[in-house]
Structures are given as structure tokens and as C-alpha cells.
Amino acid sequence: MSFQGEITHLSQKGLGVVQHPENGLSYFVAGTWPGDRGEFEITDRALNNRKYGYARLIRLIQSSRHRKTPECRFLGFSGNDCSGCPWMIADYDSQLEQKKNRFLYAMHRVGFDLADLNIGAVQPSPDLFGYRNRFQVKTDGEKLGFVAEGSHHIVPIEDCLILNPACRQHLQTLRKHLPSREWSPAPGDDWNFIDLDDQSPAEPVLLNWKQPFRQGNDAQNQWMRSWLKYALEQHGHSHKIVELFCGSGNFTEVIAQTGCPEILAYEADPQAITVLRQKNLPGVDARTADLYHPFIWKILKKNVQDAGILVLDPPRSGLKTLRGFFDAFAALETICYISCDPVTFARDAWIFCKNGWKFTDIQLIDLFPHTPHIEITATFHKQWGNTKKGNKR
């Protein structure tokens, strides 16, 4: 069953949204952009309790003025295509505008008045191609590539334009091993994965071994490090700084430059903590901790209750729970928050503000051009005597 319509906006996941002219339901459509007019086929019937469904574009009648031909020949939106860079169909200025819209929508949805938010332009990536310093491919011994969206199908990839030169060379080195019996998956598995970055050798090949987390865009990572350095300089010195989700020390290195005598850095990954400890950063005490443990703030309270500054860079889940957080960090005055998800950032920011905190700086950064991803940096300050009861969840 098909219908015609126009893409009006993008969903929080970066899919085009079109309204059915007859039933009034909204449908999410991959590979479309606001202003596209086309013919769509419903692929997922909306349930009675839902006001949306999924559809696919079967014919483009009129292109959005922002639409362009993607540079990558592997990009597509079927079950046999790579859709890792779904926004490559649009010009870059429009991509940045939509990323900002994603953030503003998330903030508005939790309760923020957008008129009170002073959000500037998104910090663009200096490079639109050749920027990515790490990648993960899947292989079954016959094919090597990325997995098609919503499937268990490996899309063979001969080249990837967003990888930096070293990673592109790694990809070619891996392809020379095909076919490989050693890369065949174990019974019951669909594939093995190979995780590489531009600082690791492509050979010998290590199957199913994950590299420690690393920001994927060096230039934008340097921008964020500079932001953190400036933020820490502006907000005075503290006798103790706590960092949560420190990884292998990307931002810990910046914190150590402040000269703070006591820096507690927490991370769940023991491998990352080992790497951080080997750096021997001055004043840094690196510790493993399950930061998503239901009683984590009670566990950490004794060690963090006198900290004046908190730096955190959580995964997409954000902090998950703030129950007991404000009690544990009783002396905290400044929070420097680096986030990779606007929805969980908005959730956490709303709870901060309802408990007497105020953000004084928010910046949006584009780490991954051609994707819906947006990075957020923000500084929060404690408004002493302005804490509202009943929001400590």
C-alpha cells in the first residue's frame, strides 16, 4: 500500500517523517530529508495504540533543496546496503541545522523553555571525510564489512571515505586475508568482529578484541579538550576533582594539567584503567567502579563528598540514576558534562536544574559528519540556597 506525501521534519533518530494524507498517521522513512516529496510504501503497520509506523521511499517526486548525491557508492537504505552515514544525502549546513534541532527538541521535551537557552551554532568538523580514527568491521570469513541496518547481513565494503588514511589502509590489509577459514564464526554466531584504530597495527589480526574507548574524530576531540581546559581555568582551582567515565584518560590528561593535588578518576573498564595508570599523570588516582550500580553514589560518597569539581563523559545512557547523587557530592560547585546523546543529556540537565544547578555554557559539536550524532559540552554551577526539594531521583 503506497501513498504520496512530503517529509516535514526528522525524528530524534534522524529519520524523515511523513504524514499519511488519509489516516493521519506519521511514518518514519530512512534516506529522506525535509522537503523531499515522494511516493512511500508502508512497511510496518501501525498498532492501535501507536500513532506512527515505518515506510520506505519508492519514488522521489521532488527533491529537497538540501538533497545531494552521496559521495559513497555503498550507501543505501535497503537490507543489503551500508547505511552508516545516512545523512550523506544532504548538504553539510543542513546537517548541522538538523543536529541542533535534535538537541533543542530533546531539551524542550523535558521541560526547558527554548527562549532561555542561548545555543550557538554547532561546532563543525574541519573534515567531512577522512576524519574517523577507529572502526569496527564484521566478518564471516567470506565477507568483511559493516552490518546493514536492522539486519544480520554483512555488507561487503571495499573502501570507506570517512576513515582516515591509516584506517583506510587497515581496511585494505584486512581484505587481503579473504577468504579466511580462521575468521569463520563459531556455531550459533553470525560473525566475528575486528576492532582497529589508527594507533594499532592491522596485523596480527585479533578477532573479537575490543579497543579501549577513544573519541573517533581527532580534530573535534582536541576542540573538546581545549574547551575543558578553558572551563577548568575559568572556574577556579579545587583541592579535589572527580572524573566519572574517564576511559583511558583522554580528558584526565587535561584535568591533570590544572595542578590539582587530588584527582579521582573512575571507569568500569579495567583495561582502560590499566592504560590510564601507565600514563603516570600527576595527582591522578585511577580506580575501577561500576558506575551504573544501583547504589553507586552511596558506594562512592566517602571518597567524593568533598570534591569541588566533577567532570563526566558518560556513554549514551547518561547518568541513568541520580538518586543519592546530590547527597554524595555535597561540596560540589562545578560540573563539566560531556555528552554524546541529547535525550539523556536533557534528562540529566533537567534534574540538575531542579536541584539548584544552572548551566552557564552549552556547546554542540559535530564529531561524526553525515550521521545524526551530536556531541554536547556543558558547564553547570551550583546555586547555593536554591535547591528544590523532591527532585533527587
UniProtKB/Swiss-Prot annotation:
**What's one GO MF term for it?**
metal ion binding
- Which residues belong to the signal peptide in this entry? none
Q: Kindly list the biological process annotations in GO that this record carries.
A: rRNA base methylation
Judged by the first EC level, this protein's enzyme class is: transferase
Q: Where does [4Fe-4S] cluster bind?
A: C72, C82, C85, C160
Keywords on record: 4Fe-4S, Iron, Iron-sulfur, Metal-binding, Methyltransferase, S-adenosyl-L-methionine, Transferase
Q: Which Pfam families match?
A: tRNA_U5-meth_tr
The EC number(s) this enzyme carries:
2.1.1.-
What the record says about family reads: Belongs to the class I-like SAM-binding methyltransferase superfamily. RNA M5U methyltransferase family.
Name this protein carries in UniProt = Uncharacterized RNA methyltransferase NE1857
Q: What organism is listed for this UniProt entry?
A: Nitrosomonas europaea (strain ATCC 19718 / CIP 103999 / KCTC 2705 / NBRC 14298)
Organism classification: Bacteria, Pseudomonadati, Pseudomonadota, Betaproteobacteria, Nitrosomonadales
